C-alpha cells in the first residue's frame, strides 16, 4: 500500500514539472511574438532628446489640431468670460519615433514626460486645469511613420469681451485662441486639420440663455516682440434667448404701467386710493429696476436696452402719479374759486357805487372855465401814460392770458384725456423700442 502511494506521488511530481516546462515555453513564445510586433520604447527613445523639437534646425514642425467642445458650463456678463470643457487633439510627425510595421500603439500617459510635446496654450485664458480623475486625462499614440497623437481634456475660463448695449436682445462673439508659448513661426506651424470640420460639439450644445448661431475657424499670425507666432482661432456667435427676460422683466414692468392707469377711473375725491396705487407702483418699479441690474456689471460706457425699457415704464408710472397731483390740485382751485364767487360779486358792486359817487362829486367841484391852459405851464407827460407803464400793462395782460389759456377749467378732463393719451403713447413707445433693438 505504501509502495503504491509512493509511485503515485512520483508520477504527480513528474506531471507537474512537465506542465511548468510547457508553460514557460508558451510564455517565451508570446514574449518573442510581442517583441516582433511592439516597438521597444527603450529602443525608440535611445538617444532621444525631448528638449529639442523634431527637425531641430530645419523646417518647422507642422502641428494639426482638432477640438471637441464637451460643454460650455457658464457665460458670465459680470466677469465677461465663459467656461468650457474641451478635448484638444494635436498631431505632428517626429522622425525620431519611426518604427517598422503599419500599426499604431497607445502608450501610458505617463510616458509623455519622455517625449517632446508642443507648448500650446490658450490665449486670454484666466484659469485652466487638466482633469486628473481617475488618472490624468491624457492620451499619447504613436504611428509607425512617426506621427504622434497627443490628446488632452481641459477645462478653461476664457475672456470674452461683450457689448451689452442691446442686452437682452444682444449677440455676443467669443473666441477660443490657441498658440505656441515659446516657438515662433520658424519652429512651429499650427493649422486646423479639417478646417471648420476640425471643431465638433458646438452644434449639439444646449445653453440656458444662449443659442449658438454659427462658428468658424481662422488661422492668423500674432506679431509680438519675440517673433511672429501662428495662432488658431475658433470664433462663435452666441445669441441670447430673450423669452426668459420677457417673462422675468418686461411683462411685470408692463403690468405695473397698466396698473398705474387704474387710478384714472377712480374719483378725484378718493385721495387715499389713488395715492396708494401711485406710490405702490412707483416703489415696485424701482425695486424691479434695481433687481435687473444685480447680475450685470456696472457699465458706465453704454446704456443697456433693458435699462431703456425700464426707464420708459418708470416714466409712465411716475407720470400717472403726477397726473393725479395736477388733477387734484386743479379741483381744489376750482372749488376755491366757486367759494369766492358770491363775495367777489358783492365786492364789485360796492366798488362800482363808490366810484360813481366819487365821480359825480368831483364833477360838481371842478369848473372847466376856471382852468387857464398855458403852453408854458402844461407838462404833457402828466397827461399821458408813460411808455414803461404801458409796456408793463401790456406784458401783464399777455401773461394773464397765457395763464388763463393753460389753466385747467375742468379738472375731470385731465382723467378723461389721460385714459386715452397714456395707453396710446405707451404703445407707440413700445413699437419704436422693439423695432429699433430687434432690427437695427
From Swiss-Prot:
The residue spans the entry assigns to the Cytoplasmic side of the membrane are as follows: 263-270, 323-419
Cystine bridges: which residues?
160-174
One family name in Pfam for this protein: Neur_chan_LBD
Q: How does it sit in the membrane?
A: Multi-pass membrane protein
Which tissues carry this protein?
A: Expressed in lungs, in alveolar epithelium.
Q: Which biological processes are named by the entry's GO terms?
A: chloride transmembrane transport
Q: What is its main location?
A: membrane
Cellular component per GO, a single term: apical plasma membrane
Q: Give glycosylation sites per the record.
A: 43, 102, 145, 196, 228
Fetch the PROSITE patterns from UniProt. NEUROTR_ION_CHANNEL (PS00236)
Leader sequence residues: 1-23
Transmembrane regions: 242-262, 271-290, 302-322, 420-440
Outline which residue ranges sit on the Extracellular face.
24-241, 291-301
Quote the catalytic activity from the record.
chloride(in) = chloride(out)
Domain of life according to the entry: Eukaryota
The text the record gives for the protein's domains is: GABAARs subunits share a common topological structure: a peptide sequence made up of a long extracellular N-terminal, four transmembrane domains, intracellular or cytoplasmic domain located between the third and the fourth transmembrane domains.
Subunit architecture: Heteropentamer, formed by a combination of alpha (GABRA1-6), beta (GABRB1-3), gamma (GABRG1-3), delta (GABRD), epsilon (GABRE), rho (GABRR1-3), pi (GABRP) and theta (GABRQ) chains, each subunit exhibiting distinct physiological and pharmacological properties.
What is this protein's name? Gamma-aminobutyric acid receptor subunit pi
Source organism per UniProt = Rattus norvegicus
Q: What is the lineage of its organism?
A: Eukaryota, Metazoa, Chordata, Craniata, Vertebrata
